[in-house]
Amino acid sequence: MLPALKKGGRPRDALGRFIRHHERLPVSLADTRGVLFVVSEMADFIKAGGLGDVAAALPRALRHRYDVRVLIPGYRAVLERAGKVEIVGRVLAHAALPACDIGRIVQSDGLPIYILLSRELFERDGSPYVSTSGSEFEDNAIRFATLSHAAADIAAGHAGLGWKPRLLHLNDWPCALAAGYVRWSGGTTPCLLTIHNLAYQGLVPYSMAGALGIPAERVAELEFYGQMSFLRGGIVNADHVNTVSVSYAKQITGPAQGCGLDRLLAGRAAKGVLTGIVNGIDASWDPRTDEYLDSHFSVNQWQGRQDNAAQVRKAFGLRESTGPLFAVVSRLVHQKGLDLICEVAPQIVAAGGQIAVIGGGEPDIERQVAELTRRYPGQVGAFIGFEEGLARRMFAGADFLLMPSRFEPCGLSQMYAQRFGCLPIAHATGGLIDTVDDGVTGFLFQHASVEALRRCLERAFRTFRLPGLLAAMRRAAMLRPSGWDVAGNKYLSLYERTAAIAPALATVS
């Protein structure tokens, strides 16, 4: 029963608050706040990179305002960790894309997860994208077009879930084609596409258009230098596009970092539908309570950092030292500037520093790192692979993080390091510009060159010899706001902006 109206027509408080609240909301989200967060990896189950961390954190950060549900492929690793999966819906075949059941689980914190089930497409060993041998799955186009089409079917209410979202949030090229499938079928569900790394575009030959169910008259939307790009199709058809940092959103509109899509992205920016939002990091990254640390510490109590440094030196076979400890927590690839680190390593060692490296990647760079450990025993140590507990202890014990990435859409390692009082030494690009305050919470250098990195290292060594300045910078880094509450609030606003772009949605039942 609605509250009674006062004589004279003004509503009583409860109804008045309801009306005033809903008058402020976009009409497209006033009645329901369902969002389908479509992603190809999620750290709860399987992770190939930073996207998996974002997918695990962002939907949870938004659930206080939206009914956010996640859609992810049913990889073998997902099914092993999911436990009992309830079949709740089904998407039909489309062109060469097979029909798939949709399973559902609910995480312990209440987050609903839809799992796209296909033994043929997803139940394999390896990562979401490559086999155990490191080669891409040959049918990735079919696999991720199936995921995208399933998202569009759910948005249209055709999957039998008894629920459909008012907005699709699509992540990177594996999900980007969903925006196209929505539009090509006459749908009006607003689509937000988040680009986590523009370099990965989902390129496939034109000959696959029919198999993917792309209308002949729309193939040009995907055209990319003689191939089709899933990501380009998403950029063209999404209502709004965002990247994972403000600076990266600007940089990709130019040829240097636009990866061949700069003119298209510049056009979207000119229309006000390209935005940058810096990622957050999970609250579990807390040096006072982190489960991976034997010795905890805070901005007011530093002893635990020294204990962690000793553990890191022991784990990497480094000698006891009072000099600075430099950490490298990264994929060992050219993009991350590992070749630059290999070039400056002799300077670091000569100045009394030590280096601990964890990660894997390009065989040539792995060999260069291994050679450094042989050349400088006790001063350079490496673990080829990844182990999260060890990585966290490195952040908690090292003095500096080396991060000379040639490009970095956002980057998470620098924020993890800052939270633990480890100062990033980073190339001024993308999200590193937005998250590292030069001389305050870390150090930036302007050009991805050996000489620029050397000059920045000299600044870091000078700071290390000034304990008061070093402590002040550590405190500033640890206190820098980097939680998902900040990023989450910006995504809430972006959801409402994106929904407002498609006013026809209000008429969809």
From Swiss-Prot:
Enzyme type, top EC level: transferase
Entry keywords, A to Z: Glycogen biosynthesis, Glycosyltransferase, Transferase
EC number annotated for this UniProt entry: 2.4.1.21
Pfam families, per database record: Glyco_transf_5, Glycos_transf_1
Keyword Lyase: no
SUPFAM superfamilies referenced in this protein's UniProt entry, alphabetically: UDP-Glycosyltransferase/glycogen phosphorylase
CDD domains for the chain: GT5_Glycogen_synthase_DULL1-like
Pathway(s) of this molecule: Glycan biosynthesis; glycogen biosynthesis
Amino-acid positions noted as binding ADP-alpha-D-glucose in the UniProt annotation, renumbered to this chain: K47
UniProt GO molecular function: alpha-1,4-glucan glucosyltransferase (ADP-glucose donor) activity; alpha-1,4-glucan glucosyltransferase (UDP-glucose donor) activity
Presence of the UniProt keyword Zinc in the record: no
GO biological process terms, semicolon-separated: glycogen biosynthetic process
Catalytic reaction(s) noted: [(1->4)-alpha-D-glucosyl](n) + ADP-alpha-D-glucose = [(1->4)-alpha-D-glucosyl](n+1) + ADP + H(+)
PANTHER family referenced in this protein's UniProt entry, alphabetically: GLYCOGEN SYNTHASE, GRANULE-BOUND STARCH SYNTHASE 1, CHLOROPLASTIC/AMYLOPLASTIC
Role, per record: Synthesizes alpha-1,4-glucan chains using ADP-glucose.
Similarity comment: family membership: Belongs to the glycosyltransferase 1 family. Bacterial/plant glycogen synthase subfamily.
Name used for this protein in its record: Glycogen synthase
Origin species: Xanthomonas oryzae pv. oryzae (strain PXO99A)
